[in-house]
């Protein structure tokens, strides 16, 4: 679910979006349980506020005229009491406490009589008395009692349900009924409310009922609601209450086909009215067929986008979907205007798939000046951007497309330096750095992601001048020392993570990176190797020894081999530039960590035996390996070859 922010000076804060965006499951903007209980009344408007904090109280006290009248009646008592006190002081009379109580009682009686005289007033009071028993959560009601009370409420309300749904307490009654009713009864409620869904969507109280109907309703009832709202979505997107209903409908409840139906409405009224005729059309096909249609669609889309952004709805996923339609057909001038409109709230785009696509397209098609504005807007959100499932794609696109690598490094390096340890062990946070190290390697970038990034690179060719490889090498030369410093400082914790070991291997077994290092950084590189060796010291019979972690063993084996494994040729390709891996590392590992006293123990341990196999394959034809081979022959007869130790079996076979 897109993150929720409050409106500030007509626009929602990008910072608030950044702080609230982390999520694994989409959450509704309008809480399903927000208005079931009185205790939640005080926070239900906070949960969906689309304007200022003052609007929260306004919504509860003034949005519904009858609720306002009730509140006014109750408030009369204080004003009346004060007025009477003043008069009595002038006349020298004392007002008794009993008189005050009598005044309150009289006013409440009058208020109750007025309520009873309203339409369905008697039924509402009867229904509320039953509802008070049904809505109890502690202790939970037995199922039979709950069904009995639900049936009783339905019998009392089925003929006047349309009179209940827009009233404060009465609306909550119907919400509870929807929550605890059977599928058939929910369908009946939906049928009873046909023709009122737009009114519900724009009501401060009715919107909660509408969201409950979407949440608990069947596929057919959702389609009924969508069909009725169709033609009004653009209007709802500009409405304070309605925008949140449309967003939840699009994100949480609509099918892919229904989403397409909803988005086409933003093209214009023609596509809202004749939706079946244009069912299979894409925006590109429509715009190719007629320049006039293209201009109308573009005008309608940017009108909705502009109004929603100014209202503070930039973070809405449905708006991102409309933006994606627009950027598909926008010319260079329109792209520039779009960037001007959005650059201050750019961080609000990156947390949804549609918004990420829009952000990447704008970055790719922007000129140097516009890219600078975008980078400035994202600077304070770098950590969230890089770790986000979709935000990291935007960041990689920036690395791919922005020629000013000095600006990129200057903008993001403070955050990267502080959080790099977290990034390299994060599923998404590590991808930008793997791109800098390896390019769009299929090992880390799926075909879908890779093709998307290649599409953005193609779009950027109109405004980006540098060769992509040159740009990547410039970034590598700037970030490589940071990689080494972080690994050298935090190697002990990084090596306990699978993704961390994988990243260290890609940093160390990398000719491109080593070629970018100066003499000082090369010394730091060797220090990292020494630190890794130190990690493997100790008794391998202890459970906490890193040799018992499969990913740590893979890293050690890769450093011993000193090259990149080629899956096609099924062999290790030696490195050309890197110093200290392969034979030197293997020799040092044996001399300083294993030695003759522990060799047999390493061979007969199932977790470490393949490390000895790697040592043998690397050192067998090298003069540096003579001490190792001599010691190996000395313990050959004591090697155990049981079924649980495949490594020792392989080693025994190689030694024959």
Swiss-Prot record:
Q: Which GO terms describe its biological process?
A: negative regulation of translation; protein stabilization; regulation of translation; ribosomal large subunit biogenesis
Regarding how it is modified after translation, the entry says: phosphorylation by CK2 relieves translational repression activity.
Q: Name one GO molecular function term.
A: large ribosomal subunit rRNA binding
Q: Which PROSITE patterns match?
A: PUM (PS50302), PUM_HD (PS50303)
Is the keyword Transmembrane helix in the record? Answer: no
Acidic residues: bias regions:
52-89
Q: Which residues carry this modification: Phosphoserine?
A: 31, 34-35
Keywords linked to the UniProt accession: Nucleus, Phosphoprotein, Repeat, Repressor, RNA-binding, Translation regulation, Transport
Q: Where are the Pumilio repeats?
A: 155-191, 192-227, 228-264, 340-376, 377-413, 415-450
Question: Which residue intervals define the domain PUM-HD in the entry?
Answer: 133-483
GO cellular component annotations of the record = cellular bud tip; large ribosomal subunit; nucleolus; nucleus; preribosome, large subunit precursor; protein folding chaperone complex
Q: Name the Pfam families on file.
A: CPL, PUF
**Which family does the entry's similarity section mention?**
Belongs to the PUF6 family.
Q: What is known about its subunit structure?
A: Component of the ASH1 mRNP composed of at least PUF6, SHE2, SHE3, SHE1 and the ASH1 mRNA. Interacts with SHE2 and FUN12.
What is its biological role?
Answer: RNA-binding protein involved in post-transcriptional regulation. Component of the ASH1 mRNP which transports the ASH1 mRNA to the distal tip of the bud, where the ASH1 protein is translated and targeted to the daughter cell nucleus. Binds to the ASH1 3'-UTR containing the PUF consensus UUGU segment and represses its translation. This silencing of ASH1 mRNA is critical for asymmetric seggregation of ASH1 to the daughter cell nucleus.
* Further remarks about this protein from its record: Present with 21500 molecules/cell in log phase SD medium.
What is the protein named? Pumilio homology domain family member 6
Naturally occurring in which organism (per UniProt): Saccharomyces cerevisiae (strain ATCC 204508 / S288c) (Baker's yeast)
């Amino acid at each position: 679910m897109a993150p929720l922010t409050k409106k500030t000076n007509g626009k929602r804060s990008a910072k608030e979006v950044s702080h609230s965006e982390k999520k694994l499951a989409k959450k509704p903007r309008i809480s399903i349980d927000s208005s079931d209980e009185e205790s939640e009344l005080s926070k239900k408007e906070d949960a969906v506020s689309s304007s200022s904090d003052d609007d929260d109280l306004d919504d509860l006290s003034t949005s519904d005229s009858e609720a306002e009248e009730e509140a006014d009646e109750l408030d009369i008592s204080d004003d009346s009491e004060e007025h009477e006190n003043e008069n009595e002081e002038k006349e020298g009379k004392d007002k008794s406490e009993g008189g005050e109580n009598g005044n309150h009682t009289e006013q409440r009686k009058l208020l109750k009589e007025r309520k009873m005289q309203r339409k369905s007033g008697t039924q509402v009071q009867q229904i509320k008395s039953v509802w008070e028993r049904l809505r109890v959560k502690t202790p939970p009601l037995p199922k039979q009692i709950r069904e009995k009370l639900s049936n009783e409420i339905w019998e009392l309300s089925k003929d006047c349900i349309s009179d209940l749904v827009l009233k404060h307490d009465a609306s909550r009654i119907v919400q509870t009924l929807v929550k605890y009713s059977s599928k058939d009864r929910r369908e009946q409620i939906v049928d009873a409310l046909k023709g009122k869904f737009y009114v519900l969507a724009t009501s401060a109280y009715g919107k909660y009922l509408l969201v409950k109907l979407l949440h608990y309703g069947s596929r057919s009832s959702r389609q009924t609601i969508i069909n009725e709202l169709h033609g009004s979505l653009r209007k709802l997107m500009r409405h304070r209450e309605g925008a949140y209903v449309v967003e939840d409908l699009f994100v949480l409840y609509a099918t892919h086909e229904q989403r397409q139906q909803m988005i086409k409405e933003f093209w214009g009224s023609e596509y809202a009215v004749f939706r079946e005729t244009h069912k299979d059309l894409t925006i590109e096909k429509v715009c190719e067929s007629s320049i006039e249609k293209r201009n109308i669609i573009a005008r309608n889309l940017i009108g909705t986008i502009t109004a929603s952004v100014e209202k503070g709805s930039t973070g809405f996923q449905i708006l991102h979907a409309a933006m994606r339609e627009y950027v598909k057909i926008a010319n260079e001038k329109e792209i520039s205007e779009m960037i001007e409109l959005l650059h201050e709230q750019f961080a609000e785009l990156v947390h949804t798939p549609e918004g990420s696509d829009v952000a990447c397209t704008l970055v790719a098609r922007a000129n140097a000046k516009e890219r600078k504005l975008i980078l400035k807007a994202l600077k304070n959100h770098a950590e969230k951007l890089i770790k986000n499932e979709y935000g990291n794609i935007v960041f990689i696109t920036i690395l791919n497309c922005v020629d000013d690598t000095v600006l990129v490094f200057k903008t993001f390096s403070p955050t990267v330096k502080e959080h790099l340890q977290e990034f390299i062990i994060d599923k998404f946070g590590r991808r930008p750095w793997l791109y800098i190290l390896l390019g769009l390697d299929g090992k880390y970038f799926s075909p879908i992601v890779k093709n998307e990034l290649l599409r953005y690179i193609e779009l950027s060719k109109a405004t980006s001048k540098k060769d992509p490889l040159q740009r990547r090498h410039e970034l590598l030369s700037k970030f490589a020392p940071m990689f080494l410093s972080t690994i050298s400082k935090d190697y002990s914790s990084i090596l306990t993570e699978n993704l961390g070991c994988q990243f260290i291997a890609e940093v160390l077994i990398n000719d491109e990176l080593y070629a970018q290092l100066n003499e000082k950084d090369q010394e730091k590189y060797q220090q990292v190797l020494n630190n890794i060796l130190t990690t493997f010291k100790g008794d391998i019979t202890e459970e906490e020894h890193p040799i018992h972690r499969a990913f740590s063993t893979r890293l050690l084996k890769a450093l011993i081999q000193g090259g990149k494994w080629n899956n096609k040729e099924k062999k290790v390709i030696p490195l050309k530039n890197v110093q200290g891996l392969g034979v030197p590392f293997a020799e040092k590992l044996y001399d300083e960590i294993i030695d003759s006293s522990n060799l047999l123990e390493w061979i007969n341990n199932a977790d470490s035996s393949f490390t000895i196999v790697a040592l043998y394959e690397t050192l067998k034809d090298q003069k540096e390996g003579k001490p190792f081979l001599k010691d190996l022959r000395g313990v050959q007869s004591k090697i155990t070859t049981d079924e649980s130790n495949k490594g020792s079996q392989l080693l025994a076979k190689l030694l024959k």
